Swiss-Prot record:
It comes from Ehrlichia canis (strain Jake). HAMAP family: GTPase_MnmE. It comes from the Bacteria. Homodimer. Heterotetramer of two MnmE and two MnmG subunits. PANTHER family: TRNA MODIFICATION GTPASE GTPBP3, TRNA MODIFICATION GTPASE GTPBP3, MITOCHONDRIAL. (6S)-5-formyl-5,6,7,8-tetrahydrofolate binds at residues 22, 80, 118, 441. GTP binds at residues 223-228, 242-248, 267-270. GO terms for molecular function: GTP binding; GTPase activity; metal ion binding. Mg(2+) binds at residues 227, 248. This is tRNA modification GTPase MnmE. Binds 1 potassium ion per subunit. Exhibits a very high intrinsic GTPase hydrolysis rate. Involved in the addition of a carboxymethylaminomethyl (cmnm) group at the wobble position (U34) of certain tRNAs, forming tRNA-cmnm(5)s(2)U34.
Amino acid sequence: MIMSTIFALCTPWGKSGVAVIRVSGKDAAKAFLHFGISSSIKPRTATFAHLYNSKGEIIDEVIIVYFVAPSSFTGEDVVEFHTHGSLAVIKMILAELGKIFVPAGPGEFSLRAFLNNKVDLTRAEAIVDLINSETEMQAKQAIRQMSGALEKLYQSWRQQLIDILSNIEAYIDFPEEVNSAALANIGYLLNNLQESLECHLNDDRKGERLRQGIYIAIVGEPNSGKSTLFNHLAKRDIAIVSEYAGTTRDTLEAHIDVAGYPIVIIDTAGIRDSADLIEQEGIRRAKLKAENADFKIVMLPYEKRNVFNNEIMNLIDEKSICVLSKADNITEHELISIFNFSFVPISVCCNRGIEILLNLIKQRVEKDFQFCSTHPFITSERQRLHIQNTLNIVKNMDLELPMEIVAEDLRLSVRELGKVVGVISDEDILDNVFGKFCIGK
């Protein structure tokens, strides 16, 4: 495949101390001559230089890093210009590069890295996840995937299928020369692989949830302090807070970081019997959010601690954290037992109990989303689809059928696993993966 030499700004557009402009392709070194750099640039060494435009006017003083293929991110010759982050300077350099090279499209540098076998598709997805990560745990998950945790797992499964397929094809072609014990073991091997695939898929979508955010709905009766707590955790005034019950009608969301985990807290309408049609819709949405959330904070006002609210108490289950709100006069930090449920007393206005609540959230999240070194999480719907397809094929294999049919099923399963890592890559799959990147990556 013949590809043009491409260029793009790799750092965010805007004023900054330093900007990085990348060039990749077989003609990348021609940029030196174009910018009037007469001295030789040593590969993999930071070199100070002046850049000149086509009129011989100086553009900027820069640091140049030159990577010779295949020892670069893309596997091609790569030149990086580390310039001052002036918009004027960036525009002038990009304009000069545009005279001899082609602007890169979104994700095109990473696409070339994939095409040149520098990364597989799971690592490519991890790159964009790392760029988009906002919390420590999101970044750690992406880095684990970039290090090849998923690739190694999927390649090992794929190799197992290839080994089985090889034995069957050998039997088809040379039945008298194949050890019958090798064929007798196929059912056992496929059963083991099926169990591994099922275990991998039955992960409660932890990787995807960690990537997108862990949802926690705040629910309770009207005026129980839900919006006040929501604003306090979000550290800004998002929800309207008033003394009038039923102020919150719709759900509101805010992203926060709890011990490195990405949490999406949801403020909801107060749950009660209401004749107001709009409030009824808000209550319906509140219950739906509570049902679909990963966890929920169920709030009960301190002054109503002895009043059994059947509708609120019915919301409490194993994924609930119970909070006794407006406990302004409580100085102890111990949990309080109410109707056989343990409540943590908090006072937002006095800033009491909030750290205990956050620690409870941390404990719940850590328990459910703890990394496992031997079983990395699936992190995208694309991966899940192909793993599920592989499982379906393996599960439905009938070893009583002619070996030619079994061999074809094995080829299909090998192909599905190949699509996960990109060994077999349809164009629409590549467009879907790399189209999510920004220009310059």
